[in-house]
Amino acid sequence: MVASTTVPYLPKIFFNLTGSRQLHGIFLIINFGLPFSMESSPSASSSSSLFWPVIFSDDSGVLFSTTSDVFFERSLLLAMSTLKICPLNLVFLALARASFVSSSTAKLTNPKPLDLLFVSLTTTACLIGAKLEKKSASCSSVTSWGIDLTNKVFISRPSSFCFETLLEGTSTFSIVSSISLW
């Protein structure tokens, strides 16, 4: 079951909710898309490496790099604000369906209470050309924060954001992020 809607005050952002039952709990996954503009491209000297940072500009004109913490903070804030304005019935429906669905990786009849609160943000991007055709570009990012509720310990996993191909010129990217709460 996938519930879809549009963020009212940001018409360019679309998102959907899915629920997934795994061994360590039930996931609530929010996928959303947001357009960004690339303001700079790699120099010829970077051709020896296929991994390089990209500078993005959002609608407010703020420039930030995919390698900076600002990118992940803004992505997480967007995901959390999306969760806040999302109708509760869609959230409960996604979680309820996930709790009753048997997963191939989780055959649980009596799941134990969770002692770990974790937020995982996965970001991927696809290059879109002037005529909205998809270009040869691929990048991914995973960043995580968590709290061990038993030991009261904050957990953080390093993140990275890289492109797997060289791009040129000014282009538009569609950033699609998934945030998982469990």
Swiss-Prot record:
Main location group = membrane
Please give the GO cellular component terms listed in this UniProt entry.
membrane
Provide the alphabetized UniProt keywords.
Answer: Membrane, Transmembrane, Transmembrane helix
Topology of the protein relative to the lipid bilayer = Multi-pass membrane protein
Say which domain of life the source belongs to.
Answer: Eukaryota
Enumerate the subcellular locations listed in this protein's record, separating them with semicolons.
Membrane
Entry's transmembrane regions = 76-96, 114-130
Q: What else is known?
A: Almost completely overlaps NOP4.
Instruction: Indicate what this protein is called per its UniProt record.
Output: Putative uncharacterized protein YPL044C
Q: What is the species listed in this Swiss-Prot or TrEMBL entry?
A: Saccharomyces cerevisiae (strain ATCC 204508 / S288c) (Baker's yeast)
